[in-house]
């Protein structure tokens, strides 16, 4: 039985009072000798963000904007799944499932809602993120999330087929969808293709110059930037205490990723705080990282993608994989270079993203 109920976001003012008290009572590190972002989030940058979060930022603005769009909670097995379902204005509107990743949320795609009126848009909160719960076992992986999303689209919402969009962990989710349910997934739009492990582990003399450049960049990135993957994959509980108890600690962990993975100069502080507020108020900073554990230890092999695939590549994203590798591994029908934006894709560049998606669907 899958019960479904309407949902609206409503964070009580008392929770913002508590947030401001916690920020005011924060104990900051004494040592300010590390400058810049190479060592993580700088103290002065984080102080400025916390000051604005406590004394200038207005969540109710975002809350009212989001509540204009239909939201629901659906009970599927032992998971409460939150999702937006915005029916298209056209008859027989093409359904689009959009899958976000970490450390973001449904907010990755929220700016595209008014740009995609002709389509039926479905954006779930991944289990463990925002208003969606984890299963009783305490973690989930991309494969299980794909099955959950397919049931949402077909059994709950009644769609026979749909287009799937994903980035970051959402990319893995929709790729499992495409390999497991190719009769239902009409097409796949990806904003990244993950990590090309076969390039990174191949001998240098077997690689093209472009592949060798990628291997060197990927090796350096994993050494300097990839520690979070190992921590979240192995010790999510230990990390979770600080993420749950301190808004400053949570922000320090997340802001670094937003800075390093995005087109930061174009990134709005309100966009950043919208996501931080959602994480803080739902206490999902600790539960969201459980997917790394699930993916590291319980993920089954993925089949080959056979459905038509589009790539929307953003210039400030991390580790862009060489196009020839993508062509070998996906049935590529469209490759769009976005004019700006980074890893958080439609949050940073909603208009170019929406145009690429519309073009892809038109030609399916």
Where are these predicted regions, by residue range?
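Alpha/beta-hydrolase
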Residues: 2-8, 12-17, 23, 27, ...
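Non-catalytic accessory segments flanking enzyme active sites
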Residues: 15-87, 271, 280, 286-300
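Glycine-rich "HGGG/HGxG" loop immediately N-terminal to the catalytic nucleophile
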Residues: 59-61, 107, 111, 126-140, ...
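Short beta-strand element of the alpha/beta-hydrolase
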Residues: 93-101
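Short amphipathic alpha-helix adjacent to the substrate-entry channel of hydrolases
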Residues: 107-121
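Conserved hydrolase catalytic core segment
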Residues: 115-118, 157-208
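Conserved acidic catalytic loop of the alpha/beta-hydrolase fold
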Residues: 143-162
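C-terminal subdomain of alpha/beta-hydrolase-fold enzymes, centered on the catalytic histidine
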Residues: 232-364
């Amino acid at each position: 039985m899958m019960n479904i109920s309407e949902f609206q976001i409503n964070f009580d003012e008392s929770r913002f009072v508590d947030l401001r008290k916690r920020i005011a009572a924060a104990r900051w590190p004494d040592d300010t000798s590390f400058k810049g972002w190479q060592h993580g989030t700088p103290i002065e940058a984080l102080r400025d963000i916390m000051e604005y979060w406590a004394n200038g930022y207005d969540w109710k603005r975002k809350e009212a904007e989001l509540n204009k769009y239909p939201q629901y909670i659906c009970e599927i097995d032992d998971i409460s799944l939150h999702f937006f379902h915005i029916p298209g204005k056209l008859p027989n509107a093409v359904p689009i499932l959009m899958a976000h990743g970490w450390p973001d949320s449904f907010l990755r795609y929220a700016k595209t809602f008014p740009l995609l009126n002709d389509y039926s848009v479905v954006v779930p909160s991944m289990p463990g993120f925002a208003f969606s719960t984890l299963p009783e076992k305490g973690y989930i992986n991309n494969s299980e999330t794909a099955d959950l999303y397919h049931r949402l689209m077909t059994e709950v919402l009644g769609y026979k087929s749909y287009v799937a969009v994903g980035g970051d962990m959402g990319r893995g989710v929709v790729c499992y969808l495409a390999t497991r349910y190719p009769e239902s997934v009409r097409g796949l739009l990806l904003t990244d293709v993950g990590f090309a492990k076969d390039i990174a582990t191949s001998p240098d003399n077997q690689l093209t110059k472009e592949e060798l450049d990628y291997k060197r960049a990927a090796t350096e990135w994993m050494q300097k930037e990839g520690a979070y993957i190992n921590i979240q994959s192995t010790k999510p509980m230990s990390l979770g205490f600080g993420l749950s108890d301190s808004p400053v600690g949570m922000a320090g962990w997340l802001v670094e990723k937003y800075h390093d993975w995005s087109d930061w100069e174009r990134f709005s502080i309100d966009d950043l705080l919208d996501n931080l507020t959602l994480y803080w108020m739902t206490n999902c900073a600790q539960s969201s990282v459980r997917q790394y554990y699930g993916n590291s230890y319980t993920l089954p092999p993925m089949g080959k993608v056979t459905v038509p695939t589009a790539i929307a590549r953003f210039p400030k994203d991390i580790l862009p994989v060489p196009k020839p590798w993508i062509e070998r591994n996906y049935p590529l029908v469209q490759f769009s270079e976005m004019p700006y934006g980074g890893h958080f894709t439609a949050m940073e560049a909603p208009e170019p993203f929406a145009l690429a998606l519309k073009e892809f669907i038109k030609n399916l």
